Amino acid sequence: MPLLIDRAERDQFIQSLTNHFETLTGDKKTSGWLIVTIHVGMFLLIMYQVFLRDSKIEVLMGAVWWLFILGTQPVFGGCGAVRVERLLLEDENWANIWCLALEPAKYIGYPLSKEAFFYLQCFTGLLLTTAVLWRVYIVLSRKDEEEK
């Protein structure tokens, strides 16, 4: 349930994003996969900036983006990009980052129920957020050689 805007406003905003992307590409399916690509690409870029870069500013930028994205979750009652993906792709096969990360569980004999998937997604998100904040703490508290 969204906290900051009501359901009608949220749905209107999501629908307008859907319409804009459909106008941009001319096709719902292409627009849906464009959103999936942007969504996964942003996630990977943020994780790259936070965990693989050693620059304080890059780690901080990645962490700020991550926290901004988490901050928008209550506005949309979940991820807004996933809601746009659902409307554009018009099918029941989810293609967001969590589904791609947790999909292999069914191939090793552990198909996830919707409830178990939700709890695992929340746990993974909390774990990732803790790791991001820990990385920021480590990088910002480190003394650079030029400061010594």
Residues of each region from the PLM?
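Membrane-water interface at the C-terminal end of transmembrane alpha helices
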Residues: 128-143
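Non-transmembrane, juxtamembrane loop and terminal tail segments
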Residues: 147-148
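Hydrophobic alpha-helical membrane-embedded segments
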Residues: 56-86
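Core segments of transmembrane alpha-helices
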Residues: 36-47, 121-129
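Hydrophobic alpha-helical transmembrane segments
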Residues: 46-54
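Individual transmembrane alpha-helix segments
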Residues: 107-129
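Cytosolic-side membrane-entry/anchor segment at the start of a transmembrane helix
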Residues: 2-44
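Extracytosolic (periplasmic/ER-lumenal) interhelical loops and adjacent juxtamembrane/interface segments
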Residues: 89-114
